[in-house]
A protein has these predicted regions:
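...with weaker cross-activation on analogous glycine-rich loops/strands in unrelated enzymes
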Residues: 5-84
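Extracellular structured ligand-interaction cores
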Residues: 45, 73-76, 158, 213, ...
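Conserved, structured C-terminal
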Residues: 86-123, 130-134, 207-466
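Acidic, proline/glycine-enriched N-terminal capping motif
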Residues: 86-194
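Short, hydrophobic/aromatic-rich segments at coil-to-beta transitions
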Residues: 42-48, 186-191, 396-397, 448-453
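A short catalytic or substrate-binding loop motif that flags glycine-/basic-rich loops and adjacent residues
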Residues: 16, 69-72, 196-198, 302, ...
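Active-site nucleophile-adjacent alpha helix/oxyanion-hole segment immediately C-terminal to the catalytic cysteine
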Residues: 1
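Internal amphipathic helical hairpin motif
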Residues: 166-202, 258-293
Length: 466
């Protein structure tokens, strides 16, 4: 009513009600279709930018709620600013590593100059814009190219940390579940990173760069702060540097990936050639010649196919992209986005933060128990005592499901035997290769045997089963 009266004089017709956009409230729908509210994600100074498609009329109406947590129990003013239509703004989300940290706006990667010419479908990947798919190809074609030929994927959103100093090995051996002391220079290992309670909050790959230098590549920017905290507690002589903005990386995956790399990679006599590079190893190299762009190439990936990852400085990224695409033009190489990557990793049974683990399950429950070598790693590491007990008394297990119907199972769907819930779907997809409906599921160990029949529940788990 207040809004109608305020803007009628501008020629806006009277209406019984107005559509509302929830900009700063933290609300959700409960299980019984009730609206729930909680502490707002917004902080003083946060803003939302909107573009008017027609003439814009602004009106304000007070809603000083101090009886619920939506305004943090303390109503504050909301200010509206208008800008000239020619004013340019970068499309961004605000990302906070911690609740009290300053917000960081979504960034472009070093490869954005090239990828933005091929697609407008970008997703925010923990503070970086990455392609979800490419206009000319689409998810299924990109997936197929990876299985049959080759694809290149921008994965620059991965966080990179340099761990340097005489106690670098001690720190990483203490904070990771894998036995870091077994690594040789040039070797890579995949590992879990756990809290004291044994719950897994991050995973990643560790590269041994030198006797006193390691590079931790992971998904969570908080991992760097956490490493600093542990180093301080143990009084380790080590420096931890965030190099995420100094290193861009693309993943070259597929049966033809080695052939493509061999066309332009130059390696010095002291480094392994691409043809010699073994699984979970890396080489220091250049493009074409000694004076070419410096690169690090690792034989790693996230697709289940033969693959490599190429690491370079962001300023060199556009040229690196051009060289890779040119080398792959006769090998069926196309760019691929996150949509295809998700299909590939689910088929391969590879885990994803927020799906298979979220800081509330241990590595055994997440399906990566092999990263916890309790029999061969004698040194102490964070979470070891709890993980020993949890391995002896497992409660959940990660399994693969084949669904009979055509409706895809989604993350969070409940899994039942009769009325009893026995598990939860962590990821699901229609597999193009298998031509089957498949899913990853964390299930009670008592129902994890092969060929056990279960039902996936939708809505409340009982009104609909698939």
């Amino acid at each position: 009513y207040n809004l109608t009266g305020a803007i009628q004089k501008y020629g806006v017709q009277k209406q019984k009600g107005w559509h509302a956009i929830n900009l700063f409230f933290n609300t959700s729908a409960g299980g019984q279709n009730t609206v729930l509210s909680d502490e707002s994600f917004a902080r003083p100074g946060d803003y939302v930018i909107m573009k008017a498609l027609k003439n814009l009329t602004c009106g304000t109406s007070a809603c000083p709620s101090d009886i619920d947590p939506c305004n943090s129990w303390n109503p504050t003013d909301i200010f509206v600013r208008t800008y000239d239509k020619n004013k340019e703004f970068t499309k961004s989300f605000a990302f906070r590593m911690k609740t009290d940290a300053e917000p960081k706006l979504t960034k472009n990667t070093g490869f954005y100059e090239r990828t933005s010419k091929l697609t407008r479908n970008f997703v925010d990947a923990r503070g970086y814009w990455l392609p979800n798919d490419y206009t000319k190809h689409g998810v299924i074609n990109e997936y197929t190219a990876c299985r049959e030929k080759a694809v290149v994927i921008d994965l620059s959103a991965l966080r990179k940390f340099e761990i340097l100093g005489p106690d670098a090995e001690e720190l990483m051996n203490y904070t990771l579940t894998r036995n870091v002391k077994k690594l040789s220079i040039g070797q890579v290992v995949y590992s879990s990173m756990c809290y004291d309670n044994g719950f897994m909050f991050d995973d990643g790959t560790l590269l041994k760069m030198s006797d006193h230098g390691f590079r931790w590549i992971c998904g969570d920017e908080y991992a760097g702060e956490w490493l600093k905290e542990q180093a301080k507690k143990k009084n380790y002589k080590v420096r931890i540097k965030n190099s995420s903005d100094q290193i861009s990386n693309i993943s070259l995956q597929g049966p033809n990936s080695r052939k493509i790399l061999e066309k332009f990679i130059w390696t010095p006599p002291t480094q392994p050639k691409i043809s010699e590079l073994q699984w979970f190893r890396f080489t220091i190299c250049r493009i074409k010649e000694l004076s070419g762009i410096p690169l690090l190439v690792s034989r790693t990936g996230y697709t289940g196919e033969l693959g490599y990852e190429i690491w370079c400085h962001p300023s060199d990224a556009p040229k690196v992209w051009d060289v890779v695409m040119d080398a792959g033009k006769d090998e069926g190489l196309i760019p691929a986005g996150f949509g295809a990557l998700d299909l590939l990793r689910i088929e391969a049974g590879l885990i994803l933060f927020g799906n298979e683990f979220d800081g509330q399950v241990d590595p055994f429950e997440a399906g990566v128990g092999f990263t916890v070598p309790l029999k061969t790693k004698n040194e102490d590491f964070i979470g070891k005592d709890i993980l020993i007990k949890r391995k002896e008394n497992p409660q959940k297990k990660m399994v693969g499901l084949e669904l009979a119907g055509k409706e895809k199972a989604n993350h969070g769907d409940c899994v039942h035997i009769g009325r009893s819930q026995v598990g939860i779907i962590t990821s699901g997809c229609i597999s193009p290769t298998l031509n089957k409906n498949i899913a990853l599921c964390r299930i009670d160990v008592g129902h994890s045997e092969l060929d056990t029949e279960v039902e996936v529940g939708k809505i409340d788990g009982h009104q609909k089963r698939i």
